[in-house]
Curated annotation (Swiss-Prot):
Record PANTHER family: BONE SIALOPROTEIN 2 (PTHR10345:SF0)
PTM annotation (Phosphoserine): residues: 31, 67, 75-76, 95, 155
Highest taxon of source: Eukaryota
Compositionally biased region (Basic and acidic residues): 141-154
Region of interest: Disordered: 60-228, 243-263
Protein name (record): Integrin-binding sialoprotein
GO molecular function terms noted in the UniProt entry: integrin binding; small molecule binding
Biased composition, class Polar residues, residue ranges: 106-130, 253-263
Domain notes: The Arg-Gly-Asp (RGD) sequence serves as an integrin-binding motif and is required for integrin-mediated cell attachment.
Keywords on record: Biomineralization, Cell adhesion, Glycoprotein, Phosphoprotein, Secreted, Sialic acid, Signal, Sulfation
Role noted for this protein: Binds tightly to hydroxyapatite. Appears to form an integral part of the mineralized matrix. Probably important to cell-matrix interaction. Promotes adhesion and migration of various cells via the alpha-V/beta-3 integrin receptor (ITGAV:ITGB3).
Designated gene of the protein: Ibsp
Quaternary state and interactors: Monomer. Interacts with integrins; the interaction promotes cell adhesion.
């Protein structure tokens, strides 16, 4: 008897837990709070009387209402075929006319739409199925948009090609202007008239005379610096129409300081030595007598100075954690 009672109690507990699990119905979107054993009836009839919300069912044409009432399934199918043929014919028309027709068709369909929703107990007949799918058939001229898309792409490509051609022409014109400007500033131009009405050839002769006088002056010079200046001006090359007029640094007699000499001795008073002393400005206190924050400059400096003198294999990894 005792064993029978024990078995019955175990079976009763199992049934109770199973029924609780059946009523609980944990869903995937439920949180962990809903996992507690609670008696919550789910109102299955109220929630699952129908699986989808009521769909709005629009008639495709005005005659579809009469066909549905009369039960002529063949007539509705014939109307669908006629619509397909008419859509194919309309796809062959021009894009401008199609846009106007689309607007008119949408207005007419919206005006003829009725807010009739079929009852849920109605039988699912073929005309009812076509009637339910009428909402998907409202955008009739989808093919028109597809036919217009390649035309728009072609026009965009033509515009891009025209823009590229214009940019290339502008670049060529700028290059020609730059070449003309360079030729105008150089002394080798023989076609440009001078300011006093003299020809470009006269200007070239004057430039040659000036160069000869410069070479004579360079030969008469005594010091090495002056010789360098004359040679520098004589051998100055016209780079992009501009003449180099800056003489070399040896012309002024300036000597660069020796390379290996320490600069701190020479320029000791000119520069302020910073970085060696610690500034208290970096420490930010919440209160006047409070402790500094964790992100102070001192903390970063200590961490960096610890790593600064050692390589990665120069210290044991444990010492760093023990010293913290």
């Amino acid at each position: 008897m005792k064993t029978a009672l024990i078995l019955l109690s175990i079976l009763g507990m199992a049934c109770a837990f199973s029924m609780k699990n059946f009523h609980r119905r944990i869903k995937a979107e439920d949180s962990e709070e809903n996992g507690v054993f609670k008696y919550r009836p789910r109102y299955f009839l109220y929630k699952h009387a129908y699986f989808y919300p009521p769909l709005k069912r629009f008639p495709v044409q005005g005659g579809s209402d009469s066909s549905e009432e009369n039960g002529d399934g063949d007539s509705s199918e014939e109307e669908g075929e006629e619509e397909e043929t008419s859509n194919e014919e309309e796809n062959n028309e021009d894009s401008e006319g199609n846009e106007d027709q689309e607007a008119e068709a949408e207005n007419s369909t919206l005006s003829t739409l009725s807010g009739v929703t079929a009852s849920y107990g109605a039988e699912t007949t073929p005309q009812a199925q076509t009637f339910e799918l009428a909402a998907l058939q409202l955008p009739k001229k989808a093919g028109d948009a597809e036919s217009r898309a390649p035309k728009v792409k072609e026009s965009d490509e033509e515009e891009e090609e025209e823009e590229e051609e214009e940019e290339n022409e502008n670049e060529e014109a700028e290059v020609d202007e730059n070449e003309l400007a360079v030729n105008g500033t150089s002394t080798n131009s023989t076609e440009v008239d001078g300011g006093n009405g003299s020809s470009g050839g006269d200007n070239g002769e004057e430039a040659e005379a000036e160069e000869a006088s410069v070479t004579e002056a360079g030969a008469e010079g005594t010091t090495g610096g002056r010789e360098l200046t004359s040679v520098g001006t004589q051998t100055a090359v016209l780079l992009n129409g501009f003449q180099q007029t800056t003489p070399p640094p040896e012309a002024y007699g300036t000597t660069s300081p020796p390379i290996r000499k320490s600069s701190t001795v020479e320029y000791g008073g000119e520069y302020e030595q910073t970085g060696n002393e610690y500034n208290n400005e970096y420490e930010v206190y919440d209160n006047e007598n409070g402790e500094p924050r964790g992100d102070t400059y001192r903390a970063y400096e200590d961490e960096y100075s610890y790593y600064k003198g050692h390589g990665y294999e120069g210290y044991e990894g444990q010492n760093y954690y023990y010293h913290q």
